[in-house]
């Protein structure tokens, strides 16, 4: 209520009455402050009020009350009016007595609030004396207990450190009181000190109430923190120790675990405790080392058990290493080659004697001590110790870059040097031994007195902390004499335990901002030096604590980010690292504020005067010393040392003037700030100078002049110059003081005295600089010096005198060497494996280094022998079984050493004979090559040749490729197998499997070098005949992928050659002149040589890649449909090969084949390209290009010297054969010379009809010339290869086309038959020549060119036909035809897979034409042509392998047409109707479908018309005699009668015919002619109409004119279109009736036709004109011959054009080609055969197709004579 009333005064001014009432209430409640507030509010109303209230003057009574109130508050002096005040109070009490209950509640509330703000701290101690640690812990514990739980939980998640727990309390602590118990008897203290110490910790932990959450772990619960820290550390160590061997066994490739731990908090623990823990952990590690080695997982133990069972405990003897001894003897023989010339004694020791000493020799092992040490660690490899040491200098950790690793190396060296800088930081025992413990000053009585003073004058909690901090940190002046009169400071003059220091540090960090503000306020008022000293000493102590904390956090961060920590498996937590970094930033900000405070403070005083005071001098030196430490920790760039050096010099000058006692300031309680003395300052000066010098080296910027830095490090490390002279000659800058020279001498001495790690790190940095600056010569010199240093050190007393760390040191040295030698080899690789030849380097220095390298080679070869022994005997344990990482590292170092030895050996050998690198004789090449081969054989046998990322393989490849490839082709093949994993066999040699990893990928440089070796291997045998194996194909593919396609845009010459090539192919026509020039080698292409970097392509890379792709394409083509994209890629490769001006005949040859395959691909899959002439142009152009490429191949082969170039002889035969076949395909069907007519670039030609672009012109050569060229080419091919039946087969066909005599043709075909029989596979025989022989003999005999007896002789000589009745005389042609039928059946039976269709067709044709056996002919042809619904296609035939492309579609047309003839002859109307839908869908499987469709439709119509006795003018006569009106009326009446009465039986066949014709019309719509179909439909309907006209009495007789309504009106005539609606209505009406009829009578069509034919025969009306078959044939004869669409010329024109071209090119053809010796006689006319009798049988299919010219000749003859003439001049298209 009171609060509300007071708040209300804020919003609105109160009147005087209200204020007086409030005054009385507050006075009654004894709230003097509130009463004063109301009176002051009332008095100030006149000045502050904006209302009328301000105009009323203040009453004097109010002022009187205010005076009395001030007197009660002791603010003013009492006056005589005290009685008035007393009376006033009594009146108020009486007036407000009714508020007594409220007053009581109010007072209770005030008392409770006061109690909450007062804290009583119970000081608990049972020990002998009270100490500040327990006091501070009790205070912290109490404050922690008062914390608000919700705030604690919320802030615990934020993990905020150094937070004052007072900030989390619920109520302010305005008063602090201490409860101090009475101490117990001293005797009990002596017995229970240890017990109470532990109880104190336990009580501290257990007194925390339940549910209380600890917030500030570091500040509020230190004991618990220490326990957690120690437990975590022990747990981590245990896990590391237990898991190290297990992890190494489970995954040998993992990094070895190092037993290092990380700090869990940035607050350092007690140094004594930590040191004790380190000592204990080391002892535990030593004691547990043995069981740690045995610890492994079950899986590893099981594996070890298995290995122990497999490897017996065999005794290792010298006989186990016979190969090694032989190998070393071989190596010594190589060394002897220049030992004689150079008078040296380079030799290798028999290391087998070292590894297996002789038993009879009682002397100790003669090997050096480090060799025995090496053998010891090999057999007893300690992963934890040795692996870490082996990799301690590794600058290429996984996942890091070279620059990053170099930085790590620098950081590591700086850490070591920083340790060196701290070597003088330890306390001076003489000066520090008198420092007492804090308990000697702060006794129990002193602390109790201090606490009693606090109780007497209660203070705020923060004020209490400041009082305690001041007492412990600031200057103290004792009042008594028992401690002397000198002032002292507890933080510097006494030794604290770490727990007290940690508590004070926490309080300092928590309160430093409050202290700083307080000191600043006091500093403004401080005038005297004595008062200032108190604050100054306090400030300096605070500053020292902050600096010490800052350095500790900084060291922790550096430890977590250091290289050693990164190598452990416990990676730093990013969140933890971020939190610690944030703490570092916070402490840094605090330090900056305090530094500014000191600067402000020192500016306000006279420093020189103040320094005269000893106390001020001490505190000033302490400040400067801590300031220097802060700057050193913050300064990471040691080049900028000027400021620190100046501060050190200043401090040194100040302190050197004092006495020794005064000049020594102990600082015993700081971990990172050592004591102040002259020696410690000098040590810091020296350390800073050294770090500055090395910083110039470590952090020298690239691109700047770093000669001084490099020279410094060279002076320190390289021992080929005097150190003193080097220092004097060193061009030091002016800034470098005398300390630099002293520091340089000191660091050299320090490196000599310190462990070898320092020198190894220094070498690493020196080599890093050489590497980064690409100073190869210096790197080589440094490497040689480093090798000398390593051997010197390993043989020194320093190494031999090591105890406990000897083996680890050996591993470190060898690991450092391994790293340096690999960097050196990388530079050698860039320098083409050549050593630097500086003027100061002599042969003696090379020999010295080589001899030292041989020592290292012997050492590391012992590792290989040891691994071999581990495979033999279980007494030897492989390093790999312990640490795969170490095993791989040793392999790398071993291989690197071998590689360096090869390089130095090569250098020495050439120096011995004094030759240049470019003039190495073959003997030297052979020696070096043999050395490499021996090394590779030995290393490969040991399965280590691929180590060091294939370094040795790379070296060997680069050296051997530069030598004669023929000498080392097997070794190069082995190198390719090991390095690139491409196994290339050479003759009988196959590379051995060395079980290597793929260590390299081909690049352009390596591809060019290896192609010079690989491509000649491919050409050892003609690749066209002996295609390289698949292993070579993989390698060629890799080469091509690296080289890629030509870049025409960047090379003008290549672009020109490419354009020239394209123009040549696109614009060249095949003329007789072009044929002549190519056959005589006169054709030239003006290609220019491309740049010199195209050697690999000129060597045949593109050609070989195209050849291999072509070979695989041919294999896939047999099983699956080929892809044009593959051929396009092949064409591109071959074209690119020619564009590089190779003029390679084989490339032209393969190009011709590739284009030929494209032509075949266009022709064999669909007939689209053959049905439309325009579509054939593209295919013809491809065929033209194919022929041009073949001719260019012939042109190039003619240029070459065939007699000397043996591989070309076999190629010429294949070239001529394939060329002749392609040209034959171009000249014959289906292309029909089209390739000689087309041109890819259309020409603009003026014609009589107008100018136009023309793509097809007349043929450039005649067919006769083409056939002669083909014949001559086949003769050349046969001379080259006489066992290819296709050559003879095609030659016989060409000879027949050239009208050679039948005997010549059949003799050639006989040879083809014999070869084919010999080469046939029983499961897939060759039947083409055998069938061709039967077909030709049949044709020759029928046309009279060959006698029957001669034909029988040829049939008898065929091994497949083998006609046994050859002696039988033949008197009649029918007998001969029967023999032909038997021979064809024999050929058919010879076809096991039933793929060939031509013999069956020929057999069916002979049966039909010669014997009239329609049924048997149908049975034979039915295997090809099928009307069954199960067969989707009409004609089902396979394409035999040797069938020419495109002929397939001609055969399908031929067979389908013949089938139509058979069905028509058999008057099988059902078969013809069933053929309609299948034929309609056959557009893609045959040519001339429209013609065949027309034939089929006309055959069906004519059979139906003949059956219904419908002649040609039947419909016209009916329409002219019938009136339109009458017909339409009668037709409607007809439909109505049929609906009512049903379909009469006599008209059922008419409706079925009408249904069939209507369906045929639908299929024919838009496809073929419709006049005959429409006329037939109308005729059928007329027959139905006439039937009803006769049967119905209501209809008028036919022919009665329809009366017109008007004489002047013109009568409408009846047309065919008037019938179609009626027909449609009739079919719709009786659709179901028709379906039922066809279902019940499926043979109704053929039955009706048969009955009609019989009826005609009975009526005697059978005549020639009425014979259906003859009529169909005569109608077919009158039709035009089916012509190939693209050749719009008949046979007469074709022959005339050919003869014309033959006449024009007679002279050229005679000079190009020579006729064969077996030319046909001049008179090639057809001889009359007495056995040839004209046959009057039905026309054949071929006659209907190809005899238009003969039809014209016999147009005037009678039909019978015409038929006989056609049969006598028969030509069969199946001969193609």
UniProtKB/Swiss-Prot annotation:
Its main location: nucleus. The keyword RNA-binding does not apply. Residues 190-206, 1716-1742, 1766-1776 have a biased composition (Basic and acidic residues). GO terms for biological process: chromatin organization; chromosome segregation. Keywords: Chromosome partition, Nucleus, Transcription, Transcription regulation. One of its GO terms (molecular function) is nucleosome binding. One of its GO terms (cellular component) is nucleus. It comes from the Eukaryota. It is found in: Nucleus. Residues 180-218, 241-260, 1709-1776 are annotated as: Disordered. Has a role in a nucleosome assembly pathway that is required for the integrity of heterochromatin and proper chromosome segregation. Belongs to the HIR3 family. This is Histone transcription regulator 3 homolog. The gene is HIR3.
């Amino acid at each position: 209520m009171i609060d509300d009333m007071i708040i209300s005064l804020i919003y609105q001014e109160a009147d005087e009455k209200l204020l007086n009432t409030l005054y009385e209430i507050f006075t009654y409640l004894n709230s003097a402050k509130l009463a004063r507030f109301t009176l002051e509010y009332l008095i100030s109303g006149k000045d502050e009020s904006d209302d009328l209230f301000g105009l009323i003057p203040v009453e004097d009574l109010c002022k009187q009350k205010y005076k009395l109130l001030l007197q009660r508050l002791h603010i003013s002096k009492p006056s005589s009016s005290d009685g008035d005040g007393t009376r006033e109070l009594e009146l108020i009490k009486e007036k407000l007595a009714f508020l007594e209950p409220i007053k009581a509640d109010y007072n209770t509330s005030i008392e409770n609030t006061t109690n909450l703000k007062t804290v009583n701290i119970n000081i608990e101690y049972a020990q002998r004396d009270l100490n500040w640690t327990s006091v501070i812990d009790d205070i912290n514990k109490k404050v922690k207990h008062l914390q608000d739980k919700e705030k604690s939980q919320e802030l615990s998640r934020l993990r905020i450190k150094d937070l004052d727990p007072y900030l989390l309390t619920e109520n302010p602590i305005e008063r602090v009181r201490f409860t101090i118990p009475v101490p117990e008897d001293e005797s009990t203290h002596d017995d229970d000190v240890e017990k109470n110490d532990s109880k104190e910790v336990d009580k501290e932990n257990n007194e925390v109430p339940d549910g209380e959450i600890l917030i500030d772990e570091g500040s509020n619960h230190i004991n618990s923190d220490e326990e957690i820290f120690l437990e975590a550390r022990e747990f981590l160590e245990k896990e590391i120790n237990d898991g190290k061997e297990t992890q190494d066994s489970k995954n040998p490739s993992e990094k070895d675990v190092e037993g290092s731990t990380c700090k869990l908090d940035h607050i350092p623990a007690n140094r004594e405790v930590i040191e004790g823990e380190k000592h204990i952990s080391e002892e535990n590690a030593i004691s547990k080392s043995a069981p740690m080695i045995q610890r492994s997982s079950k899986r590893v133990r099981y594996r070890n058990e298995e290995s122990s069972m497999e490897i017996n405990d065999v005794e290792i003897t010298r006989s186990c290493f016979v190969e090694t001894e032989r190998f070393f003897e071989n190596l010594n023989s190589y060394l002897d080659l220049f030992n004689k010339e150079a008078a040296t004694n380079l030799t290798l020791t028999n290391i087998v004697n070292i590894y297996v000493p002789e038993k009879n020799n009682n002397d100790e092992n003669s090997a050096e001590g480090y060799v025995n040490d090496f053998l010891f660690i090999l057999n007893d490899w300690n992963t934890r110790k040795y692996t870490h040491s082996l990799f301690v200098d590794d600058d290429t950790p996984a996942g890091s870059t070279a620059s990053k690793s170099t930085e790590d190396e620098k950081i590591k060296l700086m850490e070591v040097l920083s340790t060196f800088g701290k070597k003088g930081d330890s306390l001076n025992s003489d000066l520090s031994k008198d420092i007492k413990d804090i308990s000697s000053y702060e006794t129990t009585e002193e602390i109790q007195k201090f606490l009693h003073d606090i109780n007497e004058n209660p203070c705020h909690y923060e004020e209490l902390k400041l009082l305690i901090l001041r007492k412990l940190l600031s200057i103290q002046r004792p009042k008594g004499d028992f401690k002397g009169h000198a002032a002292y400071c507890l933080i510097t003059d006494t030794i604290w335990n770490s727990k007290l220091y940690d508590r004070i540090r926490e309080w300092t960090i928590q309160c430093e901002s409050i202290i700083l503000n307080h000191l600043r306020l006091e500093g403004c008022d401080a005038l005297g030096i004595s008062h200032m000293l108190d604050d100054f000493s306090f400030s300096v102590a605070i500053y020292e604590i902050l600096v010490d904390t800052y350095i500790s956090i900084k060291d922790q961060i550096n430890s977590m980010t250091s290289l050693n920590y990164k190598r452990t498996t416990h990676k730093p937590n990013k969140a933890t690292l971020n939190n610690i970094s944030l703490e570092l930033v916070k402490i840094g900000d605090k330090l900056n504020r305090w530094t500014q405070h000191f600067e402000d403070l020192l500016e306000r005083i006279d420093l020189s005067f103040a320094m005269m005071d000893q106390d001020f001098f001490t505190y000033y030196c302490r400040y400067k010393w801590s300031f220097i430490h802060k700057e050193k920790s913050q300064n990471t760039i040691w080049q900028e040392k000027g400021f620190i050096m100046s501060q050190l010099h200043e401090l040194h000058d100040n302190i050197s003037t004092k006495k020794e006692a005064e000049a020594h300031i102990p600082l015993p309680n700081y971990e990172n700030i050592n004591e102040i003395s002259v020696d410690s300052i000098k040590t810091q000066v020296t350390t800073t100078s050294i770090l500055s010098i090395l910083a110039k080296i470590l952090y020298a910027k690239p691109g700047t002049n770093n000669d001084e830095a490099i020279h410094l490090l060279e002076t320190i490390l390289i021992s080929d110059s005097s150190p003193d002279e080097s220092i004097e000659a060193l061009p030091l800058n002016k800034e470098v003081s005398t300390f630099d020279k002293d520091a340089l001498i000191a660091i050299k001495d320090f490196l000599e005295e310190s462990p070898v790690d320092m020198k190894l790190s220094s070498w690493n940095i020196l080599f890093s600089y050489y590497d980064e600056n690409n100073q190869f010569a210096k790197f080589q010199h440094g490497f040689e010096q480093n090798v000398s240093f390593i051997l010197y050190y390993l043989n020194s007393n320093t190494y031999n005198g090591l105890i406990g760390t000897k083996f680890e040191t050996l591993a470190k040295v060898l690991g450092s060497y391994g790293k340096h030698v690999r960097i050196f080899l990388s530079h050698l690789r860039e320098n083409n494996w050549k050593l630097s030849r500086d003027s100061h380097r002599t042969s003696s220095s090379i020999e010295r280094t080589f001899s030292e390298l041989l020592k290292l080679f012997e050492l590391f070869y012992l590792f290989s022998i040891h691994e071999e022994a581990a495979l033999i005997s279980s007494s030897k344990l492989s390093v790999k079984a312990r640490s795969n990482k170490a095993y791989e590292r040793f392999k790398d170092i071993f291989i690197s050493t071998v590689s360096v030895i090869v390089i130095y050996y090569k250098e020495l050998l050439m120096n011995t004979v004094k030759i240049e690198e470019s003039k190495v004789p073959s003997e030297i090449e052979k020696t070096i090559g043999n050395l490499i081969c021996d090394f590779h054989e030995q290393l490969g046998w040991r399965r280590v040749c691929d180590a060091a990322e294939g370094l040795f393989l790379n070296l060997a490849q680069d050296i051997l490729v530069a030598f004669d490839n023929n000498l080392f082709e097997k070794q190069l093949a082995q190198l390719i197998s090991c390095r690139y994993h491409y196994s290339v066999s050479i003759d009988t040699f196959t590379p051995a499997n060395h079980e290597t990893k793929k260590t390299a990928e081909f690049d352009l440089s390596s591809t060019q070098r290896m192609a010079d070796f690989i491509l000649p291997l491919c050409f050892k045998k003609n690749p066209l005949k002996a295609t390289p194996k698949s292993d070579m194909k993989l390698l060629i593919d890799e080469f091509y992928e690296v080289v890629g396609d030509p870049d025409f845009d960047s090379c003008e010459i290549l672009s020109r050659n490419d354009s020239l090539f394209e123009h040549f192919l696109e614009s060249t026509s095949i003329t007789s002149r072009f044929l002549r020039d190519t056959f005589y080698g006169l054709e030239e292409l003006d290609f220019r040589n491309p740049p010199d970097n195209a050697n690999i392509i000129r060597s045949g890379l593109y050609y070989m890649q195209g050849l291999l792709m072509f070979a695989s394409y041919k294999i896939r083509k047999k099983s699956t449909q080929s892809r044009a994209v593959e051929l396009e890629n092949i064409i591109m490769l071959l074209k690119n090969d020619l564009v590089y001006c190779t003029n390679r005949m084989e490339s032209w040859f393969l190009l011709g084949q590739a284009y030929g395959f494209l032509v075949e691909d266009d022709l064999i899959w669909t007939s689209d390209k053959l049905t439309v002439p325009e579509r054939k142009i593209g295919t013809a152009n491809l065929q033209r290009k194919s022929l041009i490429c073949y001719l260019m191949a012939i042109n190039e082969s003619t240029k070459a010297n065939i007699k000397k170039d043996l591989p070309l002889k076999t190629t010429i035969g294949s070239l001529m054969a394939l060329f002749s076949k392609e040209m034959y395909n171009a000249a014959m069907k289906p292309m029909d010379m089209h390739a000689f007519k087309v041109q890819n670039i259309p020409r603009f030609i003026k014609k009589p009809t107008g100018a136009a672009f023309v793509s097809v012109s007349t043929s450039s050569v005649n067919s006769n010339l083409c056939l002669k060229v083909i014949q001559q080419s086949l003769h050349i091919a046969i001379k080259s290869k006489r066992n290819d039946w296709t050559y003879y087969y095609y030659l016989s066909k060409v000879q027949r086309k050239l009208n050679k005599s039948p005997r010549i043709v059949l003799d050639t075909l006989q040879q083809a038959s014999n070869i084919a029989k010999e080469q046939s596979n029983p499961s897939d025989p060759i039947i083409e020549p055998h069938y061709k022989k039967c077909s030709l003999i049949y044709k020759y005999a029928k046309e009279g060119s060959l006698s029957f007896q001669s034909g029988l002789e040829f049939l008898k000589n065929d091994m497949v036909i083998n006609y046994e009745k050859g002696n039988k005389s033949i008197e009649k042609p029918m007998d001969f035809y029967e023999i032909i039928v038997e021979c064809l059946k024999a050929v058919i039976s010879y076809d096991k897979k039933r793929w060939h269709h031509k013999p069956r067709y020929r057999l069916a044709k002979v049966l039909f034409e010669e014997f009239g056996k329609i049924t048997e002919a149908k049975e034979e042809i039915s295997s090809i042509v099928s009307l069954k619904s199960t067969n989707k296609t009409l004609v089902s035939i396979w394409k035999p392998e040797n069938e020419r492309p495109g002929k397939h579609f001609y055969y399908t047309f031929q067979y389908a047409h013949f089938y139509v003839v058979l069905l028509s002859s058999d008057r099988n109307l059902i078969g013809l109707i069933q053929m309609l839908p299948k034929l309609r869908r056959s557009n893609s499987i045959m040519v001339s479908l429209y013609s065949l469709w027309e034939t089929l439709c006309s055959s069906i119509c004519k059979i139906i018309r003949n059956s219904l006795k419908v002649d040609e003018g039947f419909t016209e006569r009916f329409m002219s005699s019938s009136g339109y009106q009458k017909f339409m009326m009668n037709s409607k009446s007809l439909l109505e009668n049929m609906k009512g009465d049903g379909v009469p039986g006599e008209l059922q066949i008419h409706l079925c015919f009408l249904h069939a014709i209507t369906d045929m019309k639908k299929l024919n719509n838009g496809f073929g002619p419709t006049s005959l179909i429409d006329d037939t439909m109308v005729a059928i309907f007329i027959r139905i109409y006439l039937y009803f006209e006769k049967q119905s009495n209501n209809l008028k007789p036919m022919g009665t004119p329809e009366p017109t309504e008007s004489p002047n009106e013109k009568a409408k005539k009846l047309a065919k279109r008037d019938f179609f609606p009626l027909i449609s209505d009739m079919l719709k009406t009786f659709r179901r009736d028709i379906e039922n009829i066809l279902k019940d009578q499926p043979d109704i069509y053929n039955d009706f036709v048969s009955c009609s034919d019989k009826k005609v025969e009975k009526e005697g009306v059978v005549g020639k004109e009425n014979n259906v078959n003859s009529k169909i044939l005569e109608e077919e004869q009158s039709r035009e011959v089916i012509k190939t669409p693209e050749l719009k010329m008949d046979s007469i024109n074709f022959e005339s054009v050919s003869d014309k071209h033959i006449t024009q090119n007679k002279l050229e053809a005679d000079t190009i080609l020579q006729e064969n010796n077996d030319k046909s006689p001049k008179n090639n006319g057809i001889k009359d055969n007495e056995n040839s009798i004209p046959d009057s049988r039905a026309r054949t299919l071929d006659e209907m197709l190809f005899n238009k010219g003969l039809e014209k000749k016999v147009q005037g003859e009678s039909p019978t004579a015409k038929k006989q003439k056609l049969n006598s001049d028969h030509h069969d298209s199946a001969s193609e």
